[in-house]
Amino acid sequence: MSPMPALIEEGRAKVNLSLRVVGRRADGYHDLESVVAFADCADRLTLEPGGELKLATTGPLAAACGDTADNLVFKAAKLLAEAVPNLKLGAFALDKVLPVAAGIGGGSADAAAALRLLARLNNLSLDDPRLQKVALATGADVPVCLYSRACDMTGVGEQLLPLALPSMPCVMVNPRVPVATKDVFQALGLRNGELLVGATSVIGAPAWPEEGASIADWVEVLETVANDLEAPAMRIEPVIGEVLEALRDSAGVKLARMSGSGATCFAIYGAPAEAHAAAEKIRRDHPGWWVHAGTLS
């Protein structure tokens, strides 16, 4: 019998269009409310079925991935193997193009891609409770990345409500400075059981636009919320402020803010040509930065 062909999945970049921190729970985790979209830039994960679990990493940003044992692809696969008896495994190959520790869920998207590949190989549903539990145990952003579709995300990241986003022209910029999520939450400074000031307005999230709403409709509502991690992240890495300034000064920009815990920032535009023109200017002005022009959806 011929060997099973390789399976391929993309790990699309996650972008937090808004991110409100409700507070820090007694167990130390933070309750969040976030509108999450996904970009058209992605890592690529391949699975060669059969044999023991392996991971090889290549690509322009492979060196930033660190040790294989610490990679979330490896962690997710091992946890699923513990949860599902006789799980078929294989050799993963990761083509890494997204920045690491960048606020766009690159590692989480890769882990989610690994779970989707293993689900395909083992005829598991993405709604399988074992897979869902493993996704959350791997990382707070992995559940939303598992489905890779726009959602209103609450709790620590496990409560997902699908949203109908229009295709939004965007520019994403990372200054090639890693920012550790734990450091940003530490800088936020909430004690266990403490609510963020103003959090009462977060608990009842805005009424998000319905299917068919325009980019302008979404921008209008998104302007009423924010990313509560932006200020503490900028205290850690002030260059984030420079990135936001470059985006906000670009022609045609509708909204610009930081994604996740940084340092990647994004801007939304009314037309693809505006996004591409803005990206070209930022590349010229800041040749050391990572810049992507594309769409969010």
UniProtKB/Swiss-Prot annotation:
The active site is at K14, D141. GO terms for biological process: isopentenyl diphosphate biosynthetic process, methylerythritol 4-phosphate pathway; terpenoid biosynthetic process. SUPFAM superfamilies: GHMP Kinase, C-terminal domain (SSF55060), Ribosomal protein S5 domain 2-like (SSF54211). Its EC number is 2.7.1.148. ATP binds at P99, V100, A101, A102, G103, I104, G105, G106, G107, S108, A109. The keyword Transferase applies. It holds the Pfam family GHMP_kinases_N. Pathway: Isoprenoid biosynthesis; isopentenyl diphosphate biosynthesis via DXP pathway; isopentenyl diphosphate from 1-deoxy-D-xylulose 5-phosphate: step 3/6. The keyword Transport does not apply. GO terms for molecular function: 4-(cytidine 5'-diphospho)-2-C-methyl-D-erythritol kinase activity; ATP binding. It catalyses: 4-CDP-2-C-methyl-D-erythritol + ATP = 4-CDP-2-C-methyl-D-erythritol 2-phosphate + ADP + H(+). Keywords: ATP-binding, Isoprene biosynthesis, Kinase, Nucleotide-binding, Transferase. PANTHER family: 4-DIPHOSPHOCYTIDYL-2-C-METHYL-D-ERYTHRITOL KINASE, CHLOROPLASTIC. Catalyzes the phosphorylation of the position 2 hydroxy group of 4-diphosphocytidyl-2C-methyl-D-erythritol. Belongs to the GHMP kinase family. IspE subfamily. This is 4-diphosphocytidyl-2-C-methyl-D-erythritol kinase. It comes from Bradyrhizobium diazoefficiens (strain JCM 10833 / BCRC 13528 / IAM 13628 / NBRC 14792 / USDA 110).
